[in-house]
Amino acid sequence: MAFATRLTVDRAEMVANTSSNTPTLYATLRMDDGARFELIGLHPRPPLPGQSTRSRDANIAQAGARTPDGLSNVLAIGDFNDVPWSKTTARFAREGGYRDPRAGRGSFATFPADYAWVGWPLDQIFVKDGVKVEELVIGDNVGSDHLPLIARVCVDPMSADADIEGLFAPETPAAQGL
């Protein structure tokens, strides 16, 4: 799993929720206006034909159950290898208090990339509290087996955990006088 951002990163860590083979990314990010949110990046292994989905399902369930900084503003994204209407993904959303920004916008099938018009929405995006999705689109084929799911996200600066004054920002070397 790779992680890149233009935003300020207050913290980032990879956690093996169920297996070291399927880590989950947890990061606390800061928008340009200072508003903070936690990011959960998830990509559980897909079950092979005839295999149980238990490992994948456990990874999805555990990923949304915690956020290291305990912020209420959360963006959960990734290739869940699961559809949003499955029991597992529906449970993830329900128990974590997440909203699906696709509601009222369409299913946004991303797999398989070459036949997405008859495909499955395996790539997920969920938000909660002050995190909002302003725009959601399927990107052009970039040579992957999935099409990119592109979201323009904002964080309500008035939300409980926005911290626009930077009270909870980690100290930088410049702030420490180094």
What are these regions (language model features)?
Residues M1-L178:
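Soluble catalytic domains of enzymes that build or remodel membrane lipids, polysaccharides, and related
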